[in-house]
């Protein structure tokens, strides 16, 4: 059993990852919101990634940082604080987690880190300036740390397209919007959190032991194909 620390594991993609990996691993979830999820292998710590000190643990084999934001505004209405806040949540929060648990990860026989990017760093999309800047920082972090931490610690990121989660509910607000979003993607679908969770489970497993420093698009074809 691996000891997995998941930050932001009570909603959306993070919650789906917890459900995907908890049967065969010890999972510690750090999140602001507690749920009624219960499992012998699951421990919850109330935690705010922006302000709280990361708790101490005896061992960490895998670190997964899930917090993100969808702050979509035209550049004319985005404030500097919007950029700062998105960068703090997406990048600084992840850096704090890595720095806190890096020594424990280096002691593991099978250490890995998983972060989250977005397809908006690969594809020019209106109103995505703030989140794209922040997630581009994640892309750079993964590439740099992939080189720096090898061979002891692997690090990768998943870059999803819009995913059917609570975070995206304001965008996927009615059937017409959902239909249009489906049509924009060459594979004619919207990504589910369970699909992302299965990819996450693979990337932290021994089956992915040769993979590090990579950002994996889960994009339903929107980045790679012309629809």
Predicted ranges, named:
Residues 78, 124-132, 144:
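Active-site loop-to-helix junction immediately N-terminal to the catalytic Tyr of the SDR YXXXK motif
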């Amino acid at each position: 059993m691996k000891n997995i620390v998941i930050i932001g594991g009570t909603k959306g993609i993070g919650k789906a990852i917890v459900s995907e990996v908890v049967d065969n691993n010890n999972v510690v979830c750090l999140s602001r919101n507690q749920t009624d999820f219960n499992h012998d292998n699951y421990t919850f710590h109330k935690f705010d990634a922006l302000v709280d000190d990361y708790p101490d643990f005896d061992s960490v084999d895998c670190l997964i940082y899930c917090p993100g934001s969808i702050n979509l505004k035209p550049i004319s209405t985005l404030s500097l604080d919007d950029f700062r806040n998105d960068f703090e949540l997406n990048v600084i929060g992840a850096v704090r987690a890595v720095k806190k648990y890096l020594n424990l990860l280096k002691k593991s026989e099978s250490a890995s880190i998983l972060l989250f990017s977005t397809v908006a760093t690969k594809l020019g999309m209106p109103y995505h300036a703030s989140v794209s800047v922040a997630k581009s920082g994640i892309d750079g972090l993964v590439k740099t740390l992939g080189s720096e931490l090898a061979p002891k610690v692997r690090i990768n990121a998943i870059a999803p397209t819009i995913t059917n989660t609570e975070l995206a509910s304001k965008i996927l607000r009615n059937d017409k919007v959902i239909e249009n979003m489906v049509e924009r993607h060459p594979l004619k679908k919207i990504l589910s959190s369970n699909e992302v969770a299965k990819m996450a489970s693979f990337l932290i497993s021994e089956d992915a032991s040769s993979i590090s420093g990579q950002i994996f698009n889960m994009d339903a074809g929107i980045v790679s194909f012309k629809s």
